[in-house]
Regions:
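Short, structured coil segments at secondary-structure junctions
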Residues: 48, 70-71, 210
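A conserved acidic beta->alpha catalytic loop
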Residues: 56-64
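Acceptor/aglycone-binding surface of glycosyltransferases and processive sugar-polymer synthases
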Residues: 75-96, 101, 113-197, 224-233, ...
Length: 264
């Protein structure tokens, strides 16, 4: 089983804006994030990004107005397309803007923006095309961060199942904190993926299928009242979708049933 490289959580070694050639774009898939987007933005380390793009999935609040007041590029969907559909817009917009590295940061404050330099560093150094911010790398960190017990159990079960299917040893496949190289986004057919939460699962299986290196870095888990979160019912649907993705991956790999998600 292939090992996963753990990265130390030190931000000093990451390249700042003036020392790198790659354009770094932070994308924020937003939905009803008006109360948290400014605090999240203020916590992003200066000098480690070139542009921030907020894609609002037809929020009921004034997320777009808050983003524009912060001088952020903001795009509003005319109707709600879902979490995965939102990410598709995020990544296509980042590619159009010339991004070489794209960081997905939720605007609800659930993930610590201070880790962005560490999310970018493995791609900058040519060691990864996908970086996952794992809440499960440090024992007990998810519990200390307030992740509900049922989510911790489900996370471990699904990640173990996915690892068995992929032949990998990821500590977490269900983080929403991610970074991608331009090569990744131009190689993986992510536009064919789900518009729902299972999008995040599909891109990991695609990374493995297309042989793109993945690195994990430890991140803190932060659950609080204003943080968006998948409820139990949505979690069941997501879990079934994850198992379905694993099955499609194996059927495609074994040559039994082809899937367009794993074709160039």
């Amino acid at each position: 089983m292939a090992g996963i490289m753990a990265e130390p959580a030190t931000v000093e070694s990451a390249p700042a804006a003036g020392t790198r050639a790659e354009k770094v774009v932070i994308v924020m898939p937003a939905y009803n994030a008006a109360r948290t987007i400014e605090e999240t933005f203020r916590a992003i380390p200066a000098g480690y990004y070139d542009e921030i793009v907020v894609v609002d999935d037809h929020s009921r609040d004034d997320t777009v107005e808050r983003a524009r007041a912060l001088n952020l590029k903001a795009i509003r969907h005319p109707h709600n397309v879902g979490y995965g559909g939102n990410q598709k817009t995020c990544y296509m917009e980042a590619l159009r803007d010339g991004a070489m590295i794209v960081v997905m940061l939720h605007p609800d404050g659930q993930y610590d923006p201070a880790i962005i330099p560490e999310m970018v560093r493995p791609i900058h150094e040519g060691r990864a095309d996908m970086v996952l911010g794992s809440r499960m790398m440090v024992p007990g960190a998810a519990k200390r961060g307030g992740m509900p017990r049922w989510k911790r159990v489900a996370n471990r079960f699904l990640t173990t199942t996915e690892n068995l299917a992929m032949g990998r040893a990821f500590t977490e496949c269900h983080t929403g904190y991610r970074a991608y190289s331009r090569r990744f986004l131009e190689t993986v057919p992510f536009l064919r993926n789900s518009n729902g939460f299972v999008f995040d699962t599909e891109v990991i299986f695609q990374a493995v299928h297309f042989g793109l290196p993945v690195v994990e870095v430890p991140v803190a888990s932060r659950y609080f009242a204003d943080a968006s979160s998948v409820g139990f019912r949505q979690g069941v649907v997501y879990g079934l979708g994850t198992l379905g993705t694993a099955a499609r991956f194996l059927l495609h790999r074994w040559g039994i049933l082809s899937s367009d998600k794993f074709r160039p």
